[in-house]
Structure formats: C-alpha cells, structure tokens
C-alpha cells in the first residue's frame, strides 16, 4: 500500500473527513515520525510496533563495475519491530486467506488494530 492508497482508504472509510484533511493528517504524522527518528528518538505505538535506529558498522564493499574494494562508511538506519497485536493480526489474516479460496472478507465486521470495528 502506498501513501496515496492509504490516504484514499482512510478517506473512504471515514467520509465525514474531507479528503484534504485526511491527506494532511497522514503527511503530518509521517513528518513527525521522520523528525523524531532523525533526532534519535524511539517511537512506540502500543499494539502496532516500535521504530528505532540501528547502527550499521563500516565495511569493505566492492565496486561492481571495476571490482575495486571501497570502504562503505557506517550509518544509522531505521528499524521497525512489530508489536504482539500486529503480529497476531497478520498471522490471523494469513490463516483466513488459506481458508477462504475466493479471497472475500468474512461477513462479520473485523476489529481494527485498536479493537474498534471499522465503520
């Protein structure tokens, strides 16, 4: 799912919100998360997961064109660890896909990640 698809899905799910408001909310949230990680902060969303930074050590790489060895400097990279509730929901969804050959969603409303039923 792309950012545009996420915005469209949220706008469709919550028609009381204007599409531009949904767009603004998603972009603002992603910007805040990016700024927090860039400043070295850890982000934890209970039930969903946590974002943190991992340090990659410097290493010796190879230029694929010339075969020459080059030093690749160390750097910090974002890391995501899924929360227990997200892992369970993904596992459950995988099991549902195996039992429903037509791929249709179940007839009952499925709870969202926070336990609320989708509108």
Curated annotation (Swiss-Prot):
InterPro entries: Hist_DNA-bd (IPR000119), IHF-like_DNA-bd_dom_sf (IPR010992), IHF_beta (IPR005685). The keyword Lyase does not apply. Residues 93-119 are annotated as: Disordered. GO terms for biological process: DNA recombination; regulation of DNA-templated transcription; regulation of translation. Residues 97-112 have a biased composition (Low complexity). SUPFAM superfamilies: IHF-like DNA-binding proteins. Keywords: DNA recombination, DNA-binding, Transcription, Transcription regulation, Translation regulation. CDD domains: IHF_B. GO terms for molecular function: DNA binding; structural constituent of chromatin. It comes from the Bacteria. GO terms for cellular component: chromosome; cytosol. Belongs to the bacterial histone-like protein family. Heterodimer of an alpha and a beta chain. This protein is one of the two subunits of integration host factor, a specific DNA-binding protein that functions in genetic recombination as well as in transcriptional and translational control. This is Integration host factor subunit beta. It comes from Bordetella petrii (strain ATCC BAA-461 / DSM 12804 / CCUG 43448). The gene is ihfB.
